[in-house]
Regions:
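Positively charged n-region of N-terminal signal peptides that target proteins for export
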Residues: 1-4
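A contiguous strand-loop segment
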Residues: 21-119, 139-301
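Short, well-ordered beta-strand elements within core beta-sheets of diverse protein domains
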Residues: 123-129
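Bacterial N-terminal signal peptides
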Residues: 7-16
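Glycine-rich, aromatic-lined ligand/substrate-binding cores of catalytic
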Residues: 227-382
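Substrate-recognition/cap regions that form aromatic- and gly/pro-loop-enriched pockets
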Residues: 327-464
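Histidine-centered catalytic/metal-binding microenvironments
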Residues: 445-554
């Protein structure tokens, strides 16, 4: 059957102007502290990183909600507002419900240009109105059916205190009457629960294949799913063998290498089974050798494990971005866009890792069901590239956010000196110049900061749990804001320190206390700096090349 497909991965690999996101999911039985965890990297070359805050509110009967497309901010229409909405900080609400996503595009004829609700609006509406993952899945599907779905194919991570799910959704093929009205409004969708004790992920490719038809404990799906795919000419086999992912998001090289490989990296690092058996799949050589939707980890994962996985560049694998010629002389694990290139008529693509330079914001969110809701939900939030940015903890009950992370402090075309996004970007740009030197030091600062904050969060948990709910909310809001403010000033000092230490390709010598050594005659002329130069493999490559002949000393 001939089908057309729009693959977000193609754009990521070839042109680099599409959105590409990564979600990791860790169920409570797979985490070292018993929390459900969801990560999300909002990757886009035009996305500005800020911490979204939607305060709890009450609305009068008949109130309407204007819908603007997530990202472009294009007005789509309006829908009735709920009588009451919950507090939302980032992508977690006051009931510890967490939602993230990644876009996979899908069949080009399954996009409703007249839909009112895009995926971003559906996510945040669900966070404002729902308390559990199952409620959120049901609401998203119901609203998309009623008002039309304005986005392409999506995978949506949804976790609460007990469960973690993946929802995959795409618009039905539009059919118009003489008035231009879509008679086929609505969505096709499936959802799978990740079994407790397992980990999962998705990264711009649909991953749910077959589903158990009579297992509501573990699967949910559109009532008219099988009726629709038959009527649309997409599938005519038995329901038990129907694959959602293969039908709506057929795999190609770009999806395998640029998207599924990121999932493989997570499974390879922490999975109990040998993921080497799927190398031909993620290399793009054997699309039939699909990875499972979820795997059991070899050990339970800590918050730090999960955060650091978001900083992965395939280190230690055959896809290691620090090792190929594109890494240059400083083991740089980044490739500037466009990622596709051509040599002698052959097309090539660079690797696409979880950590990437164009991240707007990212997070690791925890739902800790053994704690009261104001205390249990924490979103560890960061802006820009995960590999060079620190996380700051924000409790789900917070009624305000730090000015340094708030909406309105700068944007992608306007610099703000008090914006954490711009400050972290300043540091990152410097890291990219000498990644194995500057980047290594920044990573050590990130690690020390996050380990300290985990201890401080544990202490704050204990303090807040002993308080009344009202006092706990006030205390945890203050804790969250002050922690973010402190981090901003810590990063400002780091930015200044790095410039002084690493200026002009040099590295200044330091005393045991961290101060810079001087020449011994005064306190303002430095000692002779160190010249760290380039990686040996880079110099070897130059020496053995045609250019090396020109540089050879005579």
């Amino acid at each position: 059957m001939k089908r057309t497909i729009i693959s977000i991965a193609i754009a990521i690999l070839a042109w680099g102007n599409a959105w590409g996101c990564t979600n990791l999911i860790v169920t409570r039985g797979a985490s070292s502290d018993g929390s459900n965890m969801v990560t999300y990297a909002a990757d886009s070359h035009t996305r500005y990183g800020f911490l979204n805050h939607l305060p709890a509110a009450k609305y009068p009967a008949g109130a309407l909600r204007a819908i603007y497309e997530y990202g472009p901010e294009r007005y789509l229409g309006q829908i009735p507002e709920a009588a009451r909405t919950f507090n939302v900080v980032g992508n977690i609400n006051e009931h510890q419900l967490i939602i993230g996503e990644s876009t996979w595009g899908g069949l080009t004829d399954h996009i409703d240009p007249k839909g009112i609700l895009d995926y971003g609006s559906l996510m945040y509406i669900a966070l404002q109105r729902c308390t559990t993952a199952r409620e959120a899945i049901t609401l998203i599907a119901k609203l998309a059916d009623e008002y039309g779905y304005a986005s392409s194919g999506e995978s949506i991570s949804i976790a609460d205190k007990q469960e973690a799910w993946i929802l995959e959704i795409i618009a039905k093929r539009p059919e118009y009457n003489e008035k231009g009205e879509n008679l086929n409004k609505g969505v096709v969708w499936v959802a799978a629960r990740i079994p407790d004790g397992y980990i999962s992920a998705h990264a711009n490719a649909a991953r749910i294949t077959t589903i158990a038809l009579n297992d509501p404990e573990n699967y949910m799906y559109a009532e008219d799913l099988f009726e629709y795919v038959r009527r649309a000419g997409l599938y005519d086999g038995v329901p038990e063998e129907f694959s959602f992912a293969d039908t709506f998001c057929p795999l190609d090289f770009s999806l395998l290498r640029g998207c599924e490989a990121r999932v493989w990296a997570f499974f390879n690092k922490f999975g109990a089974e040998d993921m080497g058996r799927y190398l031909d799949f993620v290399r793009g050589d054997n699309p039939a050798n699909r990875m499972p939707l979820y795997v059991k980890p070899a050990r339970k994962l800590s918050l730090k494990d999960v955060a650091d996985m978001m900083r992965d560049h395939y280190e230690g694998t055959e896809f290691d971005m620090t090792q190929d010629p594109g890494a240059g002389g400083h083991s740089l694990p980044y490739r500037w866009r466009p990622m596709g290139f051509e040599v002698d008529g052959e097309k090539y693509s660079q690797e696409r890792a979880i950590a990437t330079q164009q991240t707007g914001f990212w997070f690791v969110a925890q739902s800790r069901g053994w704690l009261p809701d104001p205390v249990g939900g924490v979103i560890w939030f960061g802006v820009d590239d995960a590999a060079t940015s620190p996380l700051t903890p924000v409790y789900c009950c917070a009624t305000e956010v730090s000015d340094h992370y708030a909406f309105g402090q700068g944007n992608m075309v306007q610099y703000s000196p008090i914006s954490m996004f711009w400050l972290v970007n300043r540091v990152a740009q410097f890291c990219y110049l000498r990644y194995n030197q500057v980047g290594t030091e920044v990573r050590s600062v990130v690690d020390a900061h996050e380990m300290e904050m985990m201890e401080r969060v544990a202490a704050a948990d204990a303090m807040a749990t002993a308080m009344s709910p009202r006092k706990a909310v006030k205390y945890l809001t203050r804790f969250s804001v002050e922690a973010a403010d402190e981090l901003f000033y810590k990063w400002k000092s780091l930015d200044e320190y790095l410039l002084v230490k690493y200026i002009d390709g040099n590295t200044k010598q330091q005393n045991p206390d961290g101060s810079f050594k001087t020449n011994g005659y005064n306190d303002f002329v430095p000692a002779k700096p160190m010249f760290p130069g380039y990686d040996k493999q880079f110099l070897d490559a130059i020496g053995r090349s045609e250019w090396g002949k020109r540089l050879k000393e005579r």
